[in-house]
């Protein structure tokens, strides 16, 4: 699933290509990708509009159009936005094509969970922005009896963290995903804050993690997978303590960690 670093990378690769472009036509081949409005209403509200800004909020991509419309894109598990030359053939997983004149924006999604809407849910602060502070994190941790994995995945607490980066953040901080959030000391909460900032920034620097489906808008893979210490590495030896990494389910998700050095 594209998480904060992947969506940020997609935004950065899309922006130079589509800002200032007009949407001349939209073809929707799978109606369920249009959320909360009909395909006809969606088309009416976007066709003829200019793309004036591209933003990211958590795992969501926001496309601001002239006329004060904003299209919210959620890629979910396997969604992709690809910039292609005009007239490019669609494949069996292409569910929408936006005609931008000399270019096309294709939406592909193997699992068919992603889509477009005009709504944006309420989510927590951006972890790489000034609004996310150690004090904010400590307050949320102290108020929670959930385990740390669940807290990191809760989009209402912190926007944009998914399974891959949650595991890597907890390893960086030396904290067990099973730890109850309220049990963290001041120092441990500080280390978690630093780890969140560090791992997400590295994820963006390396243009995301390409393990299965993720590519950016130019169909290029990321390379953060080369830096993964625990995610997907159950049975391997911990790079920190040389003990065996394990995989368990926490917060309903596969969780990879070192039971020896993550406490």
From Swiss-Prot:
Source species: Carboxydothermus hydrogenoformans (strain ATCC BAA-161 / DSM 6008 / Z-2901)
KW DNA damage (keyword) present: yes
First and last residues of each zinc finger (FPG-type): 229-263
One GO-annotated biological process of the protein: base-excision repair
Database matches in Gene3D superfamilies: 1.10.8.50, MutM-like, N-terminal
Active site: 2-3, 59, 253
Catalytic activity: Hydrolysis of DNA containing ring-opened 7-methylguanine residues, releasing 2,6-diamino-4-hydroxy-5-(N-methyl)formamidopyrimidine; 2'-deoxyribonucleotide-(2'-deoxyribose 5'-phosphate)-2'-deoxyribonucleotide-DNA = a 3'-end 2'-deoxyribonucleotide-(2,3-dehydro-2,3-deoxyribose 5'-phosphate)-DNA + a 5'-end 5'-phospho-2'-deoxyribonucleoside-DNA + H(+)
PANTHER family recorded: FORMAMIDOPYRIMIDINE-DNA GLYCOSYLASE
Positions with a binding annotation for DNA: 93, 111
Subunit details: Monomer.
Protein name as annotated: Formamidopyrimidine-DNA glycosylase
UniProt key word Transferase: no
SMART domains cross-referenced by the UniProt entry: Fapy_DNA_glyco (SM00898), H2TH (SM01232)
Family the UniProt entry places it in: Belongs to the FPG family.
Keywords of this entry: DNA damage, DNA repair, DNA-binding, Glycosidase, Hydrolase, Lyase, Metal-binding, Multifunctional enzyme, Zinc, Zinc-finger
Stated role: Involved in base excision repair of DNA damaged by oxidation or by mutagenic agents. Acts as a DNA glycosylase that recognizes and removes damaged bases. Has a preference for oxidized purines, such as 7,8-dihydro-8-oxoguanine (8-oxoG). Has AP (apurinic/apyrimidinic) lyase activity and introduces nicks in the DNA strand. Cleaves the DNA backbone by beta-delta elimination to generate a single-strand break at the site of the removed base with both 3'- and 5'-phosphates.
GO molecular-function term, one example from the UniProt record: zinc ion binding
Cofactor: how and how many bound: Binds 1 zinc ion per subunit.
Cofactor requirements of the protein: Zn(2+)
Record-listed E.C. numbers: 3.2.2.23, 4.2.99.18
